[in-house]
Design a protein with these regions (language model features):
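Alpha-helical bundle segments that constitute or directly flank the non-heme di-iron/ferroxidase center
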Residues: 2-32, 93-117
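Alpha-helical scaffold segments that form or flank carboxylate-/histidine-based iron centers
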Residues: 6-14, 35-53, 91-97, 122-133
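Hydrophobic alpha-helical core bundles mediating ligand binding, dimerization, or RNAP-core interactions
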Residues: 25, 55, 76-80, 109, ...
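Localized chelating/binding microdomains
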Residues: 35, 69, 140
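Carboxylate-rich helix-loop segments that flank metal/cofactor sites and access channels
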Residues: 46, 57-106
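Amphipathic alpha-helical coiled-coil segments
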Residues: 51-61, 88-91, 136-145
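A generic hydrophobic-segment detector
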Residues: 107-145
Length: 145
């Protein structure tokens, strides 16, 4: 039997993850040189955004708002991104940064799926779809590492 609280919390974490993913991609897009890499990142950003819309729609059924990414995690990501890019303006560095972010994101999402195991199947499906988007992006970026 599903638990509304677990459902809401899982959706909020997915929402924060989507926002973090979109923000991270936006941070690096202007530095990407390879058009194919840029296309991969833009496509992934669009998939993240669409999933964010699904998350918002489901949260609104519970009269809940989305969740912002952890401010400390966002700040650390910004610092790491800007430091690495300032030292190395190449696509390999950008791919490495995004892959690291995806790995952290998927790890967190698997943890949230376990923590909120009584969530509605529809919410679990959103989390799994986000994991799939992140894992596909990792696979797509391997050639740029």
């Amino acid at each position: 039997m599903s638990n509304a609280n677990d459902t809401i919390e899982l959706l909020k974490e997915c929402n924060a993850g989507v926002k973090m993913g979109v923000s991270s991609i936006n941070e690096v897009l202007d530095y990407v040189k390879d058009e194919n890499l840029k296309s991969i990142l833009i496509s992934s950003k669009e998939k993240h955004s669409m999933l964010g819309d699904d998350t918002h729609a489901m949260l609104s059924k519970y009269h809940e708002e989305g969740k912002e990414p952890n401010p400390m995690a966002k700040a650390m990501s910004w610092i790491k991104t800007n430091f690495k890019i300032s030292n190395s303006h190449n696509d390999s560095t950008i791919a490495d940064l995004i892959v690291d972010g995806c790995n952290m994101g998927t790890k967190s999402l698997y943890k949230y799926l376990n923590d909120y195991s009584d969530a509605e199947e529809k919410a679990k499906d959103i989390a799994k779809r986000l994991i799939n988007i992140e894992e596909k992006l990792i696979t797509d970026l391997r050639g740029y590492l």
